[in-house]
Amino acid sequence: MASQGTKRSYEQMETGGERQNATEIRASVGRMVGGIGRFYIQMCTELKLGDHEGRLIQNSITIERMVLSAFDERRNKYLEEHPSAGKDPKKTGGPIYRRRDGKWMRELILYDKEEIRRIWRQANNGEDATAGLTHLMIWHSNLNDATYQRTRALVRTGMDPRMCSLMQGSTLPRRSGAAGAAVKGVGTMVMELIRMIKRGINDRNFWRGENGRRTRIAYERMCNILKGKFQTAAQRAMMDQVRESRNPGNAEIEDLIFLARSALILRGSVAHKSCLPACVYGLAVASGYDFEREGYSLVGIDPFRLLQNSQVFSLIRPNENPAHKSQLVWMACHSAAFEDLRVSSFIRGTRMVPRGKLSTRGVQIASNENMETMDSNTLELRSKYWAIRTRSGGNTNKQRASAGQISVQPTFSVQRNLPFERATIMAAFTGNTEGRTSDMRTEIIRMMESARPEDASFQGRGVFELSDEKATNPIVPSFDMSNEGSYFFGDNAEEYDN
């Protein structure tokens, strides 16, 4: 990235900090996850959860959602102004699962939001600790990315289901800040912008008046975030055009869809962070681990090491495969929903299957599901190796535009060849190169056509033994060229729709 000097590292975004050196970053990220852990322990005490119950990922998710809801100011304000039947704007809650007489029981709990906020602040030295909240949002987003497909959302905005590997972070709330923006895929940003432009087309007052001015600022900011993800001058120039448009309309939507397609080959840079469920941090804090003193990083060995020594349980439905449930959660923990399965399998040390072959549904249990038949299992979240998380997009050659893997947005900085069928993608680019962006379009298409699939991405980068915490001996895996490793192959997952 040419602009590396002006960028803050993810951890600085994550902790809202200004420039810090590596030790300070590790300490502030440690403080953040330590606060999450302390909060979780306190909530388990409040709810009188036993050890097994506190390690249940479904309970962790309920507790995480409660604190996110307690701090969702915009929604809280909305709920107070639009009282709806049966919703107390001052309360939050969800299902808590308890073990009773050898069976799992569901109990719906309700808490004052004020009380939850107090417990959260107390666990975070009296601060609001928004970084910790964002961290939980990203964990939920990563879980959604691994669990659901967004075909319907893609089609609704005029995009193509084949662009699913660009959709990281598509369920992140707007309020997720800089750390959230860093993990959003190109497709996610394009979709947010298209929705905005469509509102402007349908509502004449959208860009007008005092409100419209704020809307315009948000629009330009989103354009700049997306521009920053692109790595070639032509793609960025096209984003400038979209941003500067007097009155954004269908021409801009066309440009954005073109850019999203181009990102299938000329990948954008999208950050990846291993965000773990709150109960994992809780377990570590409870066992006496001092995150702030030891320091912590979301992109190095630390999350792998934490998962090696954490036992987390999950409820399993009668016909689900526990190994598949574990794969789903492992992918969510490492933000690997869009990674090449060959790479993930190598790191995890077990062969991972595409989503179409998984015998498991989502982690969360709907309120109408029968608890009688529910069992619980240990999730296998350990790995054989660890690898550094990347944000590069995996283009093979930084100097000239070059190819990244088509149906993959790399998570790990590990060398892989690029099996890709360029013809299928290029077919999407027939026709329209007129209009004001024609020269940029022509340039982008030229770059894509000259991209060579035989190069390897992340040349010389490898995985590391779990004992190699300083990353001194990279082990460069060799992969079978023949099978492209997209997780979405033969996809039949449920849609994510709130």
From Swiss-Prot:
It is found in: Virion; Host nucleus. GO terms for cellular component: helical viral capsid; host cell; host cell nucleus; ribonucleoprotein complex; viral nucleocapsid. Keywords: Capsid protein, Helical capsid protein, Host nucleus, Host-virus interaction, Ribonucleoprotein, RNA-binding, Viral nucleoprotein, Viral penetration into host nucleus, Virion, Virus entry into host cell. A motif (Bipartite nuclear localization signal) lies at residues 198-216. Late in virus-infected cells, may be cleaved from a 56-kDa protein to a 53-kDa protein by a cellular caspase. This cleavage might be a marker for the onset of apoptosis in infected cells or have a specific function in virus host interaction. One of its GO terms (biological process) is viral penetration into host nucleus. Encapsidates the negative strand viral RNA, protecting it from nucleases. The encapsidated genomic RNA is termed the ribonucleoprotein (RNP) and serves as template for transcription and replication. The RNP needs to be localized in the host nucleus to start an infectious cycle, but is too large to diffuse through the nuclear pore complex. NP comprises at least 2 nuclear localization signals that are responsible for the active RNP import into the nucleus through cellular importin alpha/beta pathway. Homomultimerizes to form the nucleocapsid. May bind host exportin-1/XPO1. Binds to viral genomic RNA. Protein-RNA contacts are mediated by a combination of electrostatic interactions between positively charged residues and the phosphate backbone and planar interactions between aromatic side chains and bases. Belongs to the influenza viruses nucleoprotein family. This is Nucleoprotein.
